Amino acid sequence: EIRLSLVGSEMCIRDSVYANGRVTCVDAYHVCHDQVPPHALSVHLHGGTVLPGLTSYGSTLGLSDVPSESSASNGQDPSLLTRHLYLDTKRLVPRAEDGLIFGGHALRRAHASGVTTAVNAPATIGMFGGVSTHFDTGARTVLDAHSVRTSEVALHVRLAYPIDDHEPSLATQLALLRSLLRNPPPGSVEWHRVSRGEWPLVVKTDAQDTVAKLILLKRTFPQVHLIIDSAGALHEVAKDLAEAHIPVIVPAKVWEYGWEQRGRKEGPPLTADTELGVLLRHGVEVGIRIQE
């Protein structure tokens, strides 16, 4: 158990008592005093505040301690989609839980800064990612109790315009995704769960036109729990996203590195609205991600 002295002086202190992960008392010192056993840890915050821990998403946190050093990273899976369209669908689907690297410098800094958990998927080059996991940034190994909060969170896919003639077109990528949802490959537990709506399908794309096509895909497969991860312009399809009940994950701030992001609302003073403001006004469920 832990007792936190929140505000006030020695004559008037408000206490917050926590036991087994729950708040058991928030009141004046003399009210909570009887609920605090002698062995409880007492911390005086000197006018500070207590906030719930943050959950990070979108970085390589937990999967790479030094991104530029291969020996300190889980690595990236190369895509075979460029040469053999269906070969990627037959390979094993990686799980982020199997690539977690605990105790690194980045994780320690994140944990000390209030990021207590993270949700990340395996890094990949190509269309197909893997299964993300929700883990504790302060854990030492996967053997620690509650080090992995949820082993299998969602299946991740990326849709992007081809960068050379050897990559499949965006239309081909969408056709393949539609085929996988309609007829999951035999033996693919992951795609069967996604097609039945048991797992979320997180699709990363920065193109507004692709987002519109994903809305049509959701109408075709209403049982699929689709989530869009995008740094592109979403304000023009905000109403459609809300009507289709499609949550989105967006970065708090975007520097427009790609042509696909050119239509974004910059925000004040250039525009009265921001992408986030328009999405929230239309009732879209929005999550904030890290942009690396």
Protein language model annotation of sequence segments:
Residues 97, 107, 116, 120-132, ...:
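Active-site-adjacent C-terminal substructures of enzyme catalytic domains
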Residues 28-29, 64-69, 129-132, 261:
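Short, solvent-exposed loop/turn and secondary-structure capping segments
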Residues 102-225:
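Polyanionic/metal-chelating signatures
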Residues 21, 47, 58, 110, ...:
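Divalent metal-coordination and catalytic microenvironments
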Residues 1-8, 12-13:
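Single conserved hydrophobic/aromatic residue that forms the stacking wall/gate
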Residues 10, 14-26:
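N-terminal helical capping/dimerization or prosegment-like subdomains
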Residues 84-96, 218-222, 254-263:
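Short, basic, glycine/proline-bearing loop/turn elements
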